[in-house]
Amino acid sequence: RLIEDLKKLRCAIVEKMFKQSKANGRLGDFIEQVSVRNKNGLYSNVLSVSNKQGFVKQSEQFEDRTVASEDTSNYKIVKRNNFAYNPARINVGSIARLTKFDVGIVSPMYVCFRTKASIIPEYMEAFFTSQQFFYEMMKRLEGSVRLCLSYEGLCNIPVYIPDMNKQIAMGQNISLILSKIGLEIEYLGRLHQQKQYLLRKMFI
């Protein structure tokens, strides 16, 4: 119950910020594409973007099969606080900021980018969870068989960017909520483990 309430609070903070504020620019003004390749095979941490978990190790997402090519020299390098999205799955939420690892590589099909100095990545991450972003993104999907969002389409999406102090304040509020959610999930996990342990003891 508490976890759901915290998630709703996070959503409310995000929606209030973007619903009440008029766009003062487009995403292309605040982001830049990153397409550095893993030419020398320097990195082997192959990642995917999940619509629920963000960046995850590809080996964990597809445990029953190998998805990555043996030759990853054409894979794109993503660094901490970079963003990536699957053009064909962004409509179901497959866009994320890299926070779990310092660096990794993703399939060439992913679009990768980073924020410019005028915006903090936490604020941009919040925007990507807003209804405003979803509405504007859906209007820019293209394709006859599979709908995709190009980088150009992403750059054309209008966005409200406040001054740095407001960005930081919003980022801190959301980070605090996410931290509390993480602690509650960890606590529930421990309770479940304890329950399983006690049940096993009862039937020994």
Predicted segments with their positions:
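Short, well-ordered alpha-helical packing segments
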Residues: 3, 7, 28-31, 110, ...
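Non-catalytic DNA-recognition/assembly elements of restriction-modification systems
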Residues: 5-40, 156, 160, 166
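A structural feature that tracks compact, well-ordered secondary-structure segments
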Residues: 1-5, 14-17, 159-162, 168-190, ...
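Generic recognition of stable, solvent-exposed alpha-helical segments in well-folded globular domains
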Residues: 1, 8, 73, 79, ...
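Charge-rich, acidic-biased intrinsically disordered regions
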Residues: 25-29, 57, 198-204
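Juxtamembrane/interface motifs at transmembrane-helix termini
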Residues: 4-8, 19, 48-49, 62, ...
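DNA target-recognition domains and sequence-specific DNA-contacting regions of bacterial/archaeal
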Residues: 28-161
